[in-house]
Amino acid sequence: MEPANHDHQHAPNRFAVIPTPLRLNANAEYTGAGVVVAFLDSGFYPHPDLVTPVNRILAYHDVAGEQQSLTSGGPIEAWHWHGTQTSVAATGNGHLSDGLYRGLAHESKLVLVKVSERGHIGEENIARGIRWVIENRDRYDIRILNISLGGDEDVPCSKSIIDQAAEEAIKHGIVVVVAAGNSGAEGRHSIPPANSPSVITVGGYSDHNQLNGNQRGLYHSNFGVTVDGTVKPEIVAPAMWIAAPVLPGTRIYERTEALSRLAAAADYQLPGLAHELEKAAELPEQLVSADAAVIRQHVEAVLKQLKIVATHYQHVDGTSFAAPIVTSVVAQMIQANPALTPGAIKNILVSTADRILTEPVIRQGFGVVNARRAVELAQTEPHALNVVGCKPPRVENGRLLFVFHDDEATSVAVAGDFNSWERLPLKRNGSGLWTTEIVVPGAGRFEYKFVVDGQRWIEDPGNGMKAPDNVGGLNSVVVLATDYTHL
């Protein structure tokens, strides 16, 4: 596959969508420069938005060994489309849209890992792909792994080779961002790797292609309690009206070029141009002899049907695109502060997210990703939080230890049914964590929340196990299987 070359208009049409940087009110000073992002997907194409004017793809690896390089000259397959769209949505520079449809991390470099085998994606190949990223993290300085796909089996993390690989990647300093899935309308929760406790699982929302935040509504992402008892997703990002590339070298690519030329033409040009482009645009034979108004009506109807927003882009939907948008925010955060750990990044993302007040909390986690605020907090985060520091309460020497992180808080307390919901103050230690401990209350299931600055009650950002609090929110849950009081 050789990158496509172009010498024609890249103009958007009247169905154009809001570019992602504008949609998220992102800080344009941060572009992901100096950050390497790995994408695990079905397949890829060396799209001009990734390789022009400079090829930013550092490496390509095919787990199945079907395609040795992106420019090996093999046929363009349907499964190349998905990975091309996800990688461009996050890191594309908008070359084929004159910069309009660029990702937030449009100066990041990429490592592309294909995990499909003749179009099929198996659990073993996904795990192999993650392990390859771990093994090559130092060689390419990989900081982020985006996974916009999933396995087939709904199993606990401890029994999933995919989840185990994802958790291992995080232990090695790689931020893992995963799509939640698109089956929430059927009441389904996330499965591997989106159920993995330490990954950042991303659900979706729609702003109906409007900049007014009041238009936000949730997408039908997978949500709820997983087989391990954790609640996913942690955050949501745009999952509708996202500009993504049409795959070069395909029939639809040629057709949309022709249709876009027709849409951009003046009325007096349309009849002659319709005759010239009849085959390429797949126009009905009788349309060629119609007047300009009829031709234009047909062309615009087809562009709308195909979701074409510019000559080489269409709008897409799904958490497959919400995840790379969050990945691009993470790239900006790491550019702003390269010392950030996966634990710190996840903590910042959930603590800066904005909940949609009209939607159920369990479907959106901590809410809508706030790109600008996350980068601001990343700039000033002085602490390198390890994974342990951002995990659920744990038992040490017969005492239950609670940990919370918020550099802007002036006071933090914990309250739960283990202490009749009385506020127990936490103290800030030298590593930037608020901590306290209590005598282990015995075996059982306990609910709790943190209270920040005496007013804000929030669930534990480091604990995925939650339960409804009966007032529209969630309590965090800790389960103690052993009665430590008798040890």
Regions found by a protein language model. Give the residues of each.
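Short beta-alpha junctions and helix-cap segments that line functional grooves
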Residues: 25, 98-100, 162-166, 186-190, ...
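N-terminal domain-start motif of subtilase-like serine proteases
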Residues: 1-39, 49, 67-80, 215-224, ...
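Extracellular S/T/G-rich loop segment that most often corresponds to the catalytic His/Ser-adjacent loop
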Residues: 41, 61-62, 194-327, 331
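Substrate-binding/access-modulating region of protease and related hydrolase catalytic domains
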Residues: 115-198, 208-209, 227-230, 307-323
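C-terminal subdomain of the subtilisin-like protease fold in secreted/lumenal serine endopeptidases
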Residues: 11-14, 142-147, 286-321, 335-389
